[in-house]
């Protein structure tokens, strides 16, 4: 858990976690990276959040124990989440609204495109956002009135018995959930069996 403090009343909070063992490694990694934020001008960070991301994952020594994967990546997530949380608080908006109100240029600058330019470039993203600017207010109004679907993972964790998977699915259906997430990565046969159990329990019309 990271708390990013400023010389004002604002502070940002970010978290990361493992499934149990290893949280102390995340803490150690955050402590190793915190020098990159101490005494920084926060407005300089928010001018180009994509460049900020690139800077904190590019430490010439910490790259030897990363880069951008494993415990270093988990620590980076906590720090970056704290930065975004602080940014939203400074602007006096919930984070979703901060993002919605960004200009296309600001939004594109918040992304590090270096690993995805074979699929989309900054210019491509900018053009997509600019084309859709005219419908932004309408889409925001729809979200505010209708909400946005969320999913539950309560039944989808690895290691649950078949009976527990089924009962948790049915409980979630009774609570109104319509989207279900299933963890995969064990034996493929087990994943297929678990998916079948979940599908039978949630029915054909809900998303898995």
Which role fits each region the language model picked out?
Residues 1-207:
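N-terminal capping/lid subdomain adjacent to the active-site entrance of alpha/beta enzymes
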């Amino acid at each position: 858990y990271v708390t990013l403090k400023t010389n004002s009343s604002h502070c940002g909070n970010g978290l990361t976690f493992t499934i149990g063992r290893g949280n102390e490694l995340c803490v150690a990694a955050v402590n190793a990276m915190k020098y990159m934020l101490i005494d920084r001008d926060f407005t300089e960070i928010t001018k180009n959040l994509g460049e900020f991301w690139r800077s904190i994952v590019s430490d010439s020594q910490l790259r030897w124990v990363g880069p951008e994967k494993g415990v270093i990546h988990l620590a980076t997530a906590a720090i970056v989440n704290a930065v975004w949380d602080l940014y939203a608080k400074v602007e006096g908006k919930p984070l979703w609204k901060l993002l919605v109100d960004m200009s296309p240029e600001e939004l594109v600058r918040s992304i590090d495109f270096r690993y995805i330019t074979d699929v989309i470039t900054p210019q491509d993203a900018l053009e997509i956002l600019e084309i859709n600017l005219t419908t932004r207010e309408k889409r925001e109004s729809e979200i505010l009135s209708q909400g946005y679907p969320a999913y539950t993972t309560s039944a989808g964790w690895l290691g649950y018995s078949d009976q527990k998977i089924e009962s948790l699915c049915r409980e979630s259906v009774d609570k109104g959930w319509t989207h279900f997430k299933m963890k995969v990565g064990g034996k493929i046969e087990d994943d297929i069996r678990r998916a079948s159990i979940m599908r039978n329990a949630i029915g054909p019309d809900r998303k898995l």
